[in-house]
Amino acid sequence: MLSSKALLAGNGAEDCGGFIARYRTMPTQALSLKTAARLDVEPASDLGLITVLLQNKGDNRALRAELDLVLSNSAGRMSSLRMREIMDGGQPLYVAIFDYKMGEDLTFALTVNVSGEPPRSFKFVERLN
């Protein structure tokens, strides 16, 4: 079984009002074979993974949502990524796979729609090595 804590170790976080969005990006080659199989990911040197966990500020429970993610590379090429929901220990975790070149700056623009909350958008830049 996956562990959200393990996938989000060294993560970034964004305060989104009533909830916190915790995220992490990593090369798929950094995944254990067991985790890669669970995520249905074939590790490759040019594939990255993003994970997003949404936690209610009041009780830390994981929240379900609709997520829209747009990735821009250093050349300005934009692509919309499909975020898949997987259940991890009874909690929803959102994942997507993306292409990248080692050492390239990638801008992730994420919009999160949690029921009962206004949509929240934020950006962050990562470089995978």
Would you name each region that the model predicts?
Residues 59-68:
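Short flexible loop/turn segments that cap and initiate beta-strands
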Residues 9-49:
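Beta-strand-rich domain onsets/edges
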Residues 88-95:
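Aromatic sugar-binding surface patches on proteins
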Residues 118-128:
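Edge beta-strands of extracellular beta-sandwich domains
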Residues 3-9:
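N-terminal signal peptide c-region/cleavage motif recognized by signal peptidases
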Residues 49-57, 95-97:
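Short edge beta-strand/loop segments characteristic of extracellular beta-sandwich folds
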